[in-house]
Amino acid sequence: FCGFFALIIVGIPTLTVIQANRRKMQYLPPRVSIEGRGIKRGLTAVESAILMEQPLDKVMTMILFGVIKKNAAEVVTRDPLKIKSASPIPDGLHEYELNFLRAFKEESAKTRRGLLQQMMVKLVQLVSEKMKGFSRRETLDYYKAIMEKAWQQIEAADTPEVKSQKFDEALEWTMLDKNYDDRTRRVFREPMYAPTWWGRYNPTHIPASSKPTVASAPFQTSGQPVSSSGRSALPGADIAAQMVTGVQTFSSKVVGNVNTFTEKITGATNPPPKPTSSGGSGGGRSGGGCACACACAGCACACAGGGR
């Protein structure tokens, strides 16, 4: 029996640590989980990602793609990641997109990270406010269906041009897929045309034509239909790989340790409950600890007052 109880003694602290780490990643306030009625329509893909509690480095990559597609920014260098805002800033950007661009005006990595944390706190609070009175479960199902439909349209495209167009239109929605990395690599095996905004995301991209193209000219409108005129068909695997590494770039080059970054957000939006004290106020924890002395074979270790 000693081995069994030793396993329990070792296992409980390990499980506690795992649960504590998982708790730090849950940045949505508890009230969002209180079931209301009906679907909250009108959320953006980024807001839907927050509702799904997607990793925050992925959420910020979605914001990056959003401002690039809207001609509000371009990537100057990938390593280190430097972003140049358009001048003037286009109308119609969301507050979180404006805050994102403001953060990247800062040269200091520490200052930029702090501003990105503030941006994420405001975004989580915004989604929490929008979800008041609505069903999170029904809303999640609704946006997961949108995500799946976006992928189906891309997968059903019968030409590289159509596939590129569908991908361009639905990029942020496809990123809601938990298997985004694998699915992107699987779907884009054949050659495809780079999205019209590709030159603003990939500063090393050289268009096939020597003439200025939509893909190479910064801050040109990206709402034009996809055309192969003046654009090169690139290996789909290359495009897929660069989309996936965009998330990895945010993790390693901008956010740093994503767990530490997220923990700071959670501390502001979903802080852990304050411990309640019962009984005496001695140096140890009252009523919540479990001190077992397991001596030898056949002993029974009884923990009183420590269970939940």
Task: Please report, for each region that a protein language model flagged, where it lies by residue.
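Acidic, Ser/Thr/Pro-rich intrinsically disordered cytosolic tails and loops
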Residues: F1-R308
